[in-house]
């Protein structure tokens, strides 16, 4: 089993809410940035997605807040594939956000697919993208699911 991909961030003033802790949507922003960075590392840059006329689209995003994160703290965001359809169209990813001391602060689970940017329909990705997704670190509970959108 491969270690999760990990990205580090420092909480900015703009990431805070009026209570002085990390704004709820900032967790999702960090998760999205970590996801995009992982794809970039596999060669799927924004420019490459534009060439393919393909992009990721989310259907569901579930966030579980466990511990408070405050201003100027450093956090680490892990990314793992938690599910992939047999044809590669649909996928699930899990992001865990850890405080600098290793405390799990938040878990973000997302479910998405690949969108054909011309037809605006869900599309089977090219083989090179399916291969990249298959190489991504996986959660312990990773599951392959059928070609239809997972529930």
Predicted feature residues:
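Catalytic strand-loop segment that frames the active site of acyl-thioester-processing enzymes
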Residues: 1-41, 150-151
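HotDog/MaoC-like acyl-thioester-processing domains
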Residues: 3-7, 40, 69-74, 82-151
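Short histidine-centered beta-strand/loop micro-motifs
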Residues: 18-21, 67-68, 73
